[in-house]
Swiss-Prot record:
It comes from Escherichia coli (strain K12). The keyword Transit peptide does not apply. This is Dihydromonapterin reductase. GO terms for biological process: 10-formyltetrahydrofolate biosynthetic process; folic acid biosynthetic process; one-carbon metabolic process; protein homotetramerization; pteridine-containing compound biosynthetic process. It comes from the Bacteria. Keywords: NADP, One-carbon metabolism, Oxidoreductase. One of its GO terms (molecular function) is dihydromonapterin reductase activity. It holds the Pfam family adh_short_C2.
């Protein structure tokens, strides 16, 4: 008899940075992946050529979220995990209507994972005890707050709370946890002064890169016991 094909891992926002690194990590492990992307970066073509299923999605509306869910439901009979990595970053600033800023942040960080978790629940169930996972990517600011990104921080805090609610709802078949990173890697355009200021905010004074996230994701996927928890990746920043 042939070997059973592993169930795919769904990664939202998989076209760049941490989402892209996670997608390649699983591909290199011969783990099928489904990736959502908003903008067709060149990296998407690389994922497709490597065998990933890449679905363009517009999470700015609930209809867009549900259209993406329908595509996933049509493409697979089950999921190994959902990694909610899709994110947006908006600040309260002159000219930006405050209600629009809040609505945008809540849409991507709360409505989207909320709707997808419900819509795809049946794909996660039925595979055994602690056999499936949901991982929410939140943020360090959930703990501290942010005077410049109030809506962003509030939306990530709501996602953090949903981690515990969905853990209660889906146990013991599905484990639900969150990862709360601070600085993981820089953008290419970040100058030396900014980089040093950012590094000085943590005790470890380094940007560890995607591998730190990948290692934690691997731990959560292999655990058969951990659920309903948030895991900070902040280099001791809370102690500064």
């Amino acid at each position: 008899m042939g070997k059973t094909q592993p169930l795919p891992i769904l990664i939202t926002g998989g076209g760049r940075r941490i989402g892209l690194a996670l997608a390649w990590h699983f591909i290199n492990q011969k783990q099928p992946v489904i990736v959502s992307y908003r903008t067709h970066y060149p990296a998407i073509d690389g994922l497709i050529n490597a065998g990933a299923q890449c679905i363009q999605a517009d999470f700015s509306t609930n209809d867009g979220v549900m259209a993406f869910a329908d595509e996933v439901l049509k493409s697979t009979h089950g999921l190994r995990a959902i990694l909610h990595n899709a994110s947006a970053w908006m600040a309260e600033k002159p000219g930006a209507p405050l209600a629009d800023v809040l609505a945008c942040m809540m849409q991507i960080h709360v409505n989207t994972p909320y709707l997808l978790n419900h819509a795809l629940e049946r794909l996660l169930r039925g595979h055994g005890h602690a056999a499936s996972d949901i991982i929410h990517f939140t943020d360090y600011v959930v703990e501290r707050g942010s005077d410049k990104h109030i809506a962003y921080a509030a939306s990530k805090a709501a996602l953090d709370n949903m981690t515990r609610s969905f853990a209660r709802k889906l146990a013991p078949e599905v484990k639900v946890n969150s990862i709360a990173p601070s600085l993981i890697l820089f953008n290419e355009h970040d100058d030396a002064e900014y980089r040093q200021q950012a590094l000085n905010k943590s005790l470890m004074k380094t940007a560890p890169g995607e591998k730190e996230v990948i290692d934690l994701v691997d731990y959560l996927l292999t655990s058969c016991f951990v659920t309903g928890r948030s895991f900070p990746l902040d280099g001791g920043r809370h102690l500064r």
